[in-house]
């Protein structure tokens, strides 16, 4: 079980660009990492196979995974997720606040509140900023288990 990193991502910019961004970002959650940096299909298939195997063998007393040889096999794409998203899993408990109209009535601001495993998803925010250069992204994060926080 990870330490959870709390994230607040503020996105601000022209109304039409924010509306386009919100449509693009929405997938399995309002801010789906997979939309910005897609999780490889090969890992998705392995995840499904591992889940099916686990369900089929649940409760077996003659199998102890801890006794199996350590071969470096990674059925869940853990290393890929950490390298490409900056965290073990996609965002969880994602909530969208807004949009709120700016003072000039030509801009909008939205805030995504979400949790990630162990660390903030900096690579995902960097990719979003490259795809939407007209928007301003600000990520505030706090991980209370190891006592670190930051602004990105």
Predicted regions mapped to residue ranges:
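Long, contiguous binding/interaction regions
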Residues: 1-152
